[in-house]
Curated annotation (Swiss-Prot):
TM spans (from-to): 8-28, 46-66, 91-111, 151-171, 200-220, 243-263, 271-291
Keywords: Cell membrane, Membrane, Transmembrane, Transmembrane helix
Record's GO cellular component terms: extracellular region; plasma membrane
Protein name: UPF0182 protein CPE0011
């Protein structure tokens, strides 16, 4: 007796342990979603599945039970009354298993579609073929088609159940065939018809009806057809395929009646004829469609397909939100006057002279401070710095967890990043280095931007958990040879109660969490610190931008991220990158210290986000609740902009004839990614940093030019603003035909503006401008000299900005010594307008040489990239001598007198050494 009780207790404990191990993930999810304030979002899915599971289970169970009930007489006659009761138990158990599995599979795969169906929001637009609101295709049709597939699967399951029972009883007959009281199911007088003829007749009829209905539903999929010259239903789809689908549906209805009657009457010929008729129709449809396409449509394709091409143009433009672009014609004037520059001096003052690649490389060398920090990316934003609207690069300093070797360092000690580096986009120092306005640890801040808490517990590279408020404290930042510590006082993380220590030890498969003496009951474990993973855990149904960026807000750091609603079910809209409808409907804000996540709706007219608002109550906030200073940092997302640019290469036209003839197709402008050195004296490679490894190179080492965030001013506008610009060429040619800009400041946010250039003129595109740089004898000599002396030459971003009715071209050149720890420095600026091109040390000198425009004298607040003459505090005569030698060396270089150039450079080195020793 005691052993029995002991065994029961041990088994119970074992079961509890197993349940605990299995449910650890669920328990942690509940705690984590409660911490971030979205527990209702977590339970939305679970509640939906549970609500669906019960009725679906009842439906499955009842259908199968009723069907088995109709077979009871046949089964009873075969097994006898005595064994029938035991057989019923097996059938009941089998029904339970099948119903549970079927209901579970249906509920877990269809819950989201059902919620979308029941919370559908109309688009207010209809497709041109069936006159259905777009919401029918996006929210309703997927569920209806899935339910029909499920119903067909259920019919097949019932047929299989019938066959299995029939065969099982047949196997039993072979075992007991010597017993006279058992009916032989395999006898000629007793077959499957007598066993389940009526049931199979009903199933066959229902299956035929379902197939017919599925063809009616299939006709709606023609709005996604790729058969014609444009996406969506074409002439053949509407005039041939759609009619065939209707005929097949009618034939299936007739066949269902024929099959039912014929099975009951044992007449198989009508069944064969009806099934064969449907098969012939199914086979005949593509044959007739191909014939019609080749011999009717092809000879008259333009006329017959024209209305359907128009449908595709209209739908694609609406779906990708490019139907309201403000298009302006521009015929660039090749002569920018100094008066025009003076009128647009705010454009000149904000010209982008820094590029992300070299800048990030410099940050990594100078601003890491310690090797356990890293800069993942440098993002572009704008701030009012000391009263001036300024575009800046911002890069947060995060912990490099790859450099951590011990568990304590990785999870207890080095828990957070610290501060950021911020530098101006439009200026460099006298040495060509970034012009910092925030830098170092502790933060050296030369702006009026308030940053009181620079700590980063949540970032782009934080993929591991950390435990804060431990006995030893957390490393905060270095001061000389000492380390400052910090104890986390935020709201993020889960309390490390004894229960949670056991729970996370099991979850992380690491007993150190349980055994460490540094962890107390006041300690907290912070999970999902990677901001992308964090928001995906909360709202996986949104698509997130690939480039989150950090913002200084209210004395602390927060991340901003763009989120998209999208679908591939928009009728007649041609898909790009897996979607054919997209909206930037949500801005996500993540607190870098506490981990709080807020989702703000920015597009209240988007039906998909309005559907989500009904499904996930409490998840989204109206834009009116966002702090106003955060709205000032809205960026038009680059991922969306580049997707829209790709769509525009084909769908910038309104005329269906132009789309059909492909006479006006565009390409996004190309840029040289690597240049192998035919202009270089020693074959040294000139590297390109403007592509950032995102675009795929072609065989000529060319890739699509990326859109760039620039501070500029559009023609006819009064103020500079941050914009995203992209450039287009005529397909197969390199001459630029259009410039696209996305506005993002204030009330102009989201507006797209396009300037079209006359196609008969040659307008320099980025790649033509780059080729021109490399072919210019003066520029190529200078670059060849640097490369020949062992320096690495790096081209910056190519900038093309409109100045009233003209275009100004800008490129910068960086030099980097061929050593492991060298830093790129911006040494030259190339400016061009029309046929003129110059290379100089800075913007001011280039403007003076190209346009005779002296911005330094006429503009008191000129760009900082002009070399200051007051920052060298040594002997003034020495400085003047050095400047004279440098100017003479450059003059000799321009004249091709390399011997004289070398002499002046040697003398310059001696003078600089002398100054440095004084």
């Amino acid at each position: 007796m005691k052993n029995k009780i002991l065994n029961t207790v041990l088994i119970s404990i074992l079961l509890l342990v197993v349940v605990f191990f299995v449910s650890t993930n669920f328990i942690i999810n509940v705690q984590w979603f409660k911490e971030v304030g979205y527990l209702n979002v977590f339970f939305t899915k679970l509640i939906a599945i549970c609500k669906l599971f019960v009725p679906i289970f009842i439906l499955y169970f009842c259908v199968i039970a009723i069907y088995l009930f109709t077979l009871r007489k046949s089964i009873r006659s075969l097994v006898g009354d005595t064994k029938f009761k035991s057989v019923k138990k097996y059938f009941l158990l089998s029904n339970l298993v099948i119903s549970i599995l079927g209901a579970g599979a249906t509920a877990t795969t269809q819950w989201y579609k059902i919620l979308q169906f029941t919370n559908a929001v109309p688009f207010g637009e209809v497709d041109p073929i069936f006159n259905k609101d777009i919401s029918f295709y996006v929210f309703k049709l997927p569920l209806v088609q899935s339910l029909f597939s499920t119903a067909i699967s259920l019919i097949i399951i019932l047929v299989l159940i019938t066959v299995i029972i029939y065969l099982a009883l047949g196997f039993k007959d072979k075992i007991y065939q010597n017993k006279d009281n058992v009916i032989n199911i395999n006898s000629k007088t007793y077959g499957i018809r007598k066993f389940a003829g009526k049931q199979l007749a009903v199933l066959a009829s229902v299956l035929s009806l379902l197939i017919g209905c599925s063809y009616l539903l299939k006709s709606y999929n023609l709005v996604y057809s790729t058969r014609g010259v444009s996406y969506g239903a074409g002439y053949t789809d509407v005039k041939i395929t759609m009619i065939f689908y209707k005929v097949i549906a009618v034939a299936c209805v007739i066949s269902s009646i024929v099959v039912f009657i014929s099975i009951l009457k044992l007449k198989f010929r009508p069944i064969i004829i009806s099934i064969a008729s449907i098969a012939v129709l199914i086979v005949l449809e593509p044959v007739v469609a191909i014939f019609t396409q080749q011999f009717v449509v092809k000879p008259n394709e333009m006329e017959l397909e024209k209305p359907y091409i128009s449908y595709s143009i209209d739908a694609t433009k609406k779906a990708f939100n490019i139907d309201e672009i403000e298009v302006k014609e521009m015929e660039p004037n090749e002569n920018i006057t100094s008066e025009k520059l003076e009128d647009n001096k705010d454009i000149i003052e904000n010209l982008k002279v820094n590029s992300t690649g070299p800048l990030l490389s410099f940050y990594q060398q100078v601003q890491l401070i310690k090797n356990y920090y890293e800069f993942n990316d440098a993002d572009t934003d704008r701030y009012n710095i000391n009263g001036k609207y300024t575009q800046v690069f911002v890069s947060p300093r995060e912990i490099n967890r790859d450099s951590m070797t011990t568990w304590q360092n990785k999870h207890l000690r080095y828990t957070h990043g610290y501060g950021l580096a911020m530098s101006r986009v439009n200026s460099v120092t006298e040495f060509g280095q970034p012009d910092f306005v925030m830098k170092d640890i502790p933060t050296v801040n030369t702006t009026d931007i308030n940053l009181e808490n620079p700590r980063i517990y949540f970032g782009e590279s934080d993929n591991d958990y950390v435990i804060v408020n431990t006995e030893g404290g957390e490393f905060d930042y270095p001061t000389g040879d000492t380390e400052n510590t910090f104890n986390y006082n935020g709201t993020g993380g889960l309390k490390m109660t004894p229960f949670n220590r056991v729970l996370f030890s099991i979850y992380e498969r690491n007993p150190k969490i349980l055994m460490s003496s540094s962890i107390t009951s006041e300690s907290r474990i912070i999970l999902n610190r990677n901001i992308v993973k964090r928001v995906q855990e909360i709202a996986p149904f949104l698509t997130y931008d690939s480039d989150p960026y950090i913002v200084v807000h209210d004395g602390r750091l927060v991340w901003m991220m763009d989120a998209y609603t999208s679908t591939d079910k928009y009728p007649f809209s041609e898909p790009h990158e897996g979607v054919n409808y997209i909206r930037n409907s949500v801005k996500v804000v993540i607190d870098a210290f506490n981990g709080n996540v807020d989702f703000y709706v920015t597009d209240e007219n988007d039906p998909i986000i309005n559907c989500y608002l009904k499904i996930y109550k409490g998840l989204f906030k109206p834009l009116s609740e966002m702090p106003e200073d955060l709205k000032e940092h809205f960026r038009y997302p680059q991922d969306l902009f580049e997707l829209q640019s790709k769509v525009l290469t084909k769908y910038h036209v309104d005329d269906p004839i132009k789309l059909f003839t492909e006479e006006d197709l565009w390409d996004r402008s190309l840029e040289v990614v690597k240049h192998g050195g035919e202009n270089l004296s020693q074959g040294d490679e000139v590297k390109e940093e403007s592509i950032l490894n995102k675009a795929k190179e072609n065989k000529n080492n060319e890739a699509e030019n990326e859109g760039l965030y620039l501070m500029t001013k559009l023609p006819d506008e009064e103020n500079v603003e941050m914009m995203l610009l992209d450039y287009f060429n005529m397909r197969g040619k390199q001459s630029m035909v259009a410039l696209l800009g996305a506005r993002m400041d204030g009330d102009n946010y989201g507006e797209l503006v396009m300037y079209k250039f006359p196609p008969q003129r040659t307008i320099y595109s980025p790649i033509l401008f780059k080729n021109r740089i490399q072919q210019d004898p003066n520029i190529s000599k200078e670059i060849s000299l640097w490369a020949g002396k062992g320096s690495e030459v790096i081209y910056g971003d190519i900038i093309i900005v409109p100045i009233e009715d003209s275009l100004l071209y800008l490129n910068t050149i960086y030099l980097k010594a061929n050593s492991e720890n060298s830093m790129p420095e911006m040494k030259r600026v190339i400016l061009s307008n029309g046929d003129k091109i110059v290379i100089e040390e800075n913007i001011e000198k280039a403007l003076l040489k190209l346009f005779n425009y002296n911005s330094s004298e006429e503009n008191k607040n000129s760009n900082k990239d002009e070399t200051p003459k007051t920052e060298i505090t040594s002997d003034k005569s020495g400085v003047k001598e050095a400047a004279d030698l440098f100017n003479k060396a450059i003059e000799a270089q321009k004249n091709g007198d390399w011997a004289t150039y070398g002499e002046f450079i040697n003398k310059l080195g001696d003078v600089l050494n002398k100054i440095s020793q004084e």
